[in-house]
Amino acid sequence: MDLVTIKGVSKRSKKPIVLTVEQCLILISFLPDPYRTMVIVSICTGCRVSEILALRWSRIDFDKLTMMVKVKVKAVNERIGRVKTEYSEDELPIDPQFARVLKAWKKKCPSSPGDWVFPSAFTDRCYHASPIQQDYIRPAGKKLGLESVGWHTFRHTYRTWLDATGAPVGVQQKLLRHADVGTTMKYGNALMESKRDANRKVVRMARPLLQQAQA
């Protein structure tokens, strides 16, 4: 482990887990829906789980192949609130093959008064992240021999896959929506087409997952 110093406080940090395509494919095979589709959304968009759980169908434009991230589920009280910063609020590209997975899920998704993409079967609202991680994702990771697979694993995997496909740092930052003003100023704003191209390459890596989801 490495020692990380933050304003006079030292703490140990674990190296983040990065999954291979093969590991992701096996992991989602252990997950029932809707959790399997949630994980696929995370891997194919890099969205935070708080943003995924707060997704509404009205924010997804299947004609333009875009998804607007505006709100999240707050961890403290599980209520819906705006995303943390202006950098977190953005329009993201969605790949056509990934869009087909979303459309297939929409057909079998239970109807929801709140227009949720992932409405809870128990409350008619959105799901809570922690129980899903503890009851489904972490046990699935342990079957792969990985002890600490969690929601952030998929976001970190997405970032690593972006890097592996050669996506420029500025484009990565816009897709992940990090609030790093210095990096934004240094690399400039990424155009939607640049973001779409970078995202497309990651989704191509994840194609086996999408094919399994549609099987």
PLM region spans:
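C-terminal catalytic core of tyrosine-transesterase DNA break-rejoin enzymes
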Residues: 33, 37-40, 44-51, 131, ...
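Active-site/catalytic core of tyrosine-dependent DNA strand-transfer enzymes
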Residues: 22, 64, 73-75, 95-147
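C-terminal secondary-structure termini that scaffold catalytic or DNA-interacting sites
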Residues: 64, 75-100, 104, 108, ...
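Residue-level signal for well-ordered alpha-helical positions
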Residues: 30, 55, 104-108, 187-190
